[in-house]
Amino acid sequence: MAVYTDVAADELADFLSGYDLGDLLSYKGIAEGVENSNFLLHTTRGHFFLTLYEKRVAKADLPFFLNLMGHLAARGITCPQPVANRGGETLGTLAGRPAAIIDFLEGVWPRKVSVPHCAAIGEALAKLHLAGADFKMTRANALSVAGWRPLFEAAVARADTVQAGLRDFLATELAHLEANWPQALPRGIIHADLFPDNALFVGDTLSGLIDFYFACNDLLAYDVAICLNAWCFEADHSFNVTKASTFLNAYGKVRPLSEPEQAALPLLARGAALRFLLTRLVDWLNVPPGALVKPKDPLEYVRKLRFHQGVRTIAGYGLARSESVT
């Protein structure tokens, strides 16, 4: 979450007049994440999140995201729900941006990821994949393999200003992934951005999954690979095989990975690392002036990608091939 668009108090008051949320007591911008402008609202009826949808979120996609949250919640996935205004609409316009109010979930995201956190995320991700199986709406993943070359082209001219040799490193890896990306694996609804700051915990207990604005239809095992990158590395960028094996085993107890999915996981993890490397690189090079935002280091994902390049089988992630297989 972040703030790219400021909201004046009178604009916000006018917007909120269409909702039954009580009186506004306070609001503040939230300087985390990189995609939308987010505010925490405190009203006489409680706390809510206000989101203004920015650059990468198309207005046409918003019904998919909001309906998906309702679908998942109806199937036992704890996630935030959009709040309808008095006209029954969950989308409005504020400060020239599409805007929605989302209900508030208790909990905080884990600043220091533990093994129990990884177990909870593995189980929750598998349940999400199963719960999304009968969701009728579809959305292509614009940030899967077909979307990486445009990102590369947007950053390539200045890539070496971030790290010497980065341009050639990216070009070689992108070509390899484009030539070898798997297609015949199970597909369905994926979260596509399930990082620690998109999962809320009370202690070691998961209290909710948030930020579904990258959710889409893609390879289910690709979502697993994203979580390996997001949850299983330490602050010094070393890979924690205990966290990885815990995460994978917890996932597999709910939705076992097939043999082809297991075989593809190292390549999928490379792709996931490249995807976040490229989007971080583009953001690093193009932060809007004056934005209340903390750009994330793209070089973190260079190191992760190099690790995955050295993994040949799922055993490199701490899971024997006999485990969690259908």
UniProtKB/Swiss-Prot annotation:
SUPFAM superfamilies: Protein kinase-like (PK-like). It comes from the Bacteria. Pathway: Amino-acid biosynthesis; L-threonine biosynthesis; L-threonine from L-aspartate: step 4/5. Keywords: Amino-acid biosynthesis, ATP-binding, Kinase, Nucleotide-binding, Threonine biosynthesis, Transferase. Its EC number is 2.7.1.39. GO terms for biological process: threonine biosynthetic process. GO terms for molecular function: ATP binding; homoserine kinase activity. It catalyses: L-homoserine + ATP = O-phospho-L-homoserine + ADP + H(+). The keyword Cytoplasm does not apply. The keyword Ion transport does not apply. PANTHER family: AMINOGLYCOSIDE PHOSPHOTRANSFERASE DOMAIN-CONTAINING PROTEIN, AMINOGLYCOSIDE PHOSPHOTRANSFERASE DOMAIN-CONTAINING PROTEIN-RELATED. Belongs to the pseudomonas-type ThrB family. This is Homoserine kinase. It comes from Afipia carboxidovorans (strain ATCC 49405 / DSM 1227 / KCTC 32145 / OM5) (Oligotropha carboxidovorans). The lineage of its organism: Bacteria, Pseudomonadati, Pseudomonadota, Alphaproteobacteria, Hyphomicrobiales.
